[in-house]
Amino acid sequence: MRPCMIHGPGNKGNLNLLYNVVSKGIPWPLGAFENHRSFTSIQNLCTVIEGLLTQKVVSGIYHMADDEALSTNELIEVICEVLGKKANIWCIPKGVMNVMAKIGGWLHLPLNPNRMQKLVENYVVSNAKIKKVLGLQKMPVSAKEGLTYTILSFKKR
């Protein structure tokens, strides 16, 4: 099984970093980039693991993800919805942001071309194969529901 980014209560990593930026009201300057990323909620992962352990499944490579891929802008909107805040997404033109990243690379700043690429690239996987072998029409938890559950756990810290 090959899960993409797994999240849930106690999560540590890039989702926490984005949550901290958004919760402080810092604007997201990359709103012009409409990337999409797959996520895996811990609830859906547990459902799939239980299915793999209790059903006879042919060995193979199975990608694991929630049913929907979200853009970073949509993810920020989910975070803000949980926090009761208005999303602060700036749509600075892509060309301007690319130039800023190049300058950041020359000056050894945090925003450089490599980091920019990681922030705006797509990473979408299909969970159709794993759902088919387990007889699932859809995952039990939507991407938004799973992320809301995770973000609520950040709020409690």
Where are the regions a protein language model picked out?
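A short C-terminal helix-loop "cap" of Rossmann-like NAD(P)-dependent dehydrogenase/epimerase domains
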Residues: 19-30, 85, 110, 128
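Non-catalytic, hydrophobic alpha-helical segments
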Residues: 45, 49, 64, 75, ...
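A conserved pocket-lining segment of Rossmann-fold NAD(P)-dependent short-chain dehydrogenase/reductase
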Residues: 20-40, 48-52, 56, 63
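Amphipathic terminal alpha-helices
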Residues: 129, 137, 141-157
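Glycine/proline-rich active-site loop of Rossmann-fold NAD(P)-dependent oxidoreductases
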Residues: 7-17, 52-62, 68-71, 84-87
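Terminal hydrophobic/aromatic helix or amphipathic segment near a protein terminus
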Residues: 81-124
